[in-house]
UniProtKB/Swiss-Prot annotation:
CDD domains: TilS_N
Record gene name: tilS
PANTHER family per UniProt: TRNA(ILE)-LYSIDINE SYNTHASE-RELATED
GO CC annotations, alphabetized: cytoplasm
Chain sites annotated for binding ATP: S31, G32, G33, A34, D35, S36
Chief location category: cytoplasm
EC annotation from Swiss-Prot or TrEMBL: 6.3.4.19
InterPro entries according to UniProt: Rossmann-like_a/b/a_fold (IPR014729), TilS/TtcA_N (IPR011063), tRNA_Ile_lys_synt (IPR012094), tRNA_Ile_lys_synt_N (IPR012795)
UniProt-recorded name of the protein: tRNA(Ile)-lysidine synthase
Organism the protein comes from: Borreliella afzelii (strain PKo) (Borrelia afzelii)
Keyword line: ATP-binding, Cytoplasm, Ligase, Nucleotide-binding, tRNA processing
């Protein structure tokens, strides 16, 4: 196959060499539109047809338009002798997005990427090729800027991200249109492209024309910002940049270093760790900003941020990011704890350092886990009402303290704080927890 314009071929060759990519089989995300058609034909030529076109039918648009697009895709691949796989979405994206509380765009993207990953494995391919171009990159940077992204966001769409490649990121939309026109190649026009249904369309159709009128050549400036942002991001990727102690279920930071470091670097470090652990978390800047209001000299330990997957805590002179996977290793407990003696739990070794009760001779307490809470109440409803006060605490960390079978205190083993006490009986208590999730 020979094209009248080989400019895109040159850029794809440069892209492959720059990123040291092999020429093994590629799954090409194909919609029949201008960008993916250009990518498909150029990769067919560059990789000697070692490609598979993959079409994902979302069925967000009317069925008749979706079916016409499918027919176009089939006819196109037959014409150019390209292997094609079609996958139809098995959920109703519109109704499911409402149920999940996410945007149609976000859910559609997730379904599409999952299908592409499955196609990659099923066909023993090396890469998934997406047709994002230079203009898509500019739109993305603008959207992320107005959404308050960090440098990682302003770096733009990565050209290579694990097994996903984007060979057209250095190719502009006019270059794509010129390629299609010169070679008389027909494409399918998505009717929603001209409608302002989605954020990208609004940016493309409404915002960019206004920016172009005021800031001529703004694209070059945004490309420069993107390049500088990438350099900073790559520099901050160095492991030694911020000292971190890593355990089985936690990451621990020095409190002073944590607070002295620029907020941006702390935020991206937290997100980087969460991503490495496979945790997708939506945390607001406001919530993260609260972390920096900690008083260094204050001795009190406390939970700073809590989600379903992890929590951030201040403990002594450390900030700890702890994952809730420890619940798999947790075992209920019921034992007698004496002053000055250690006792082993699944959460670590515990020491009762100090105990003062109204009875001077008391030097031991009965300690048990949350599972045994009902033994101290004759009425279950009263028990439920009483323990509803501690709904914000993780139950696996609550240690109940009893004297003569009477509940006199509750300690949160995560923070080592006394969260409740019968003040007429329990005057003072101090414990240590070593090992388990965290090392002291």
């Amino acid at each position: 196959m020979h094209f009248l314009d080989d400019n895109i071929q040159i850029k794809i060759d440069k892209f492959y060499k720059k990123n040291s990519l092999n020429k093994n089989r590629v799954i090409v995300a194909f919609s029949g539109g201008a960008d993916s058609t250009t990518l498909l034909l150029n990769l067919k030529y560059y990789l000697s047809n070692n490609i598979i076109a993959f079409y994902f039918a979302h069925f967000i648009r009317p069925d008749n338009e979706q079916n016409k697009e499918i027919e176009h895709v089939k006819g196109f691949c037959d014409l150019y002798n390209i292997a094609l796989q079609i996958k139809k979405c098995d959920i109703d994206i519109k109704s499911e997005s409402v149920r999940l509380g996410v945007s149609i765009e976000e859910l559609a993207r997730k379904c599409r990427y999952n299908a592409l990953e499955n196609a990659l494995k099923e066909n023993d391919a090396n890469y998934i090729a997406l047709a994002h171009n230079e203009n898509d990159q500019i739109e993305t940077i603008i959207m992320r800027f107005f959404q308050g992204s960090f440098l990682d966001g302003l770096a733009g769409i990565p050209s290579v991200n694990k097994n996903i490649i984007r060979p057209l990121l250095e190719v502009s939309r006019p270059e794509i249109e010129n390629f299609l026109s010169l070679n008389n190649i027909r494409v399918f026009i998505d009717s929603t492209n001209s409608q302002n249904l989605y954020l990208r369309n609004k940016v493309r159709n409404n915002l960019l024309p206004s920016i172009e009128k005021i800031f001529k050549g703004y694209e070059k400036c945004l490309k420069r910002i993107s390049e500088f942002s990438k350099e900073f991001v790559n520099y901050f990727e160095k492991d030694e940049f911020f000292p971190v102690e890593k355990g089985k279920y936690y990451y621990s930071f020095d409190l002073k270093a944590f607070l002295d470091f620029p907020k941006y670097l702390v935020f991206r470090l937290i997100f980087k760790i969460l991503n490495s652990e496979g945790i997708v978390a939506k945390i607001s800047y406001k919530a993260l900003n609260e972390l920096f209001k900690i008083e260094i000299d204050r001795k009190k330990n406390n939970v700073l941020l809590k989600t379903n997957d992890f929590f951030l805590e201040k403990r002594h002179n450390k900030i700890n990011l702890i994952f809730k996977r420890d619940e798999k290793f947790y075992k209920p407990f019921d034992f007698i704890l004496e002053v000055g003696k250690w006792h082993s739990l699944s959460l670590g070794k515990i020491l009762l350092k100090c105990l003062e009760c109204n009875a001077a001779s008391v030097s031991r307490l009965k300690c048990c886990s949350y599972e045994f809470r009902y033994k101290f109440f004759k009425d279950k409803l009263k028990a439920k009402k009483f323990f509803s006060k501690f709904i914000r605490c993780n139950p696996i960390y609550l240690m109940l303290l009893a004297l003569d079978n009477r509940l006199i205190g509750i300690i949160d083993l995560n923070t080592l704080n006394l969260v409740w006490s019968e003040k007429s009986i329990l005057k003072k208590i101090s414990i240590s927890l070593i090992g388990g999730l965290l090392k002291e």
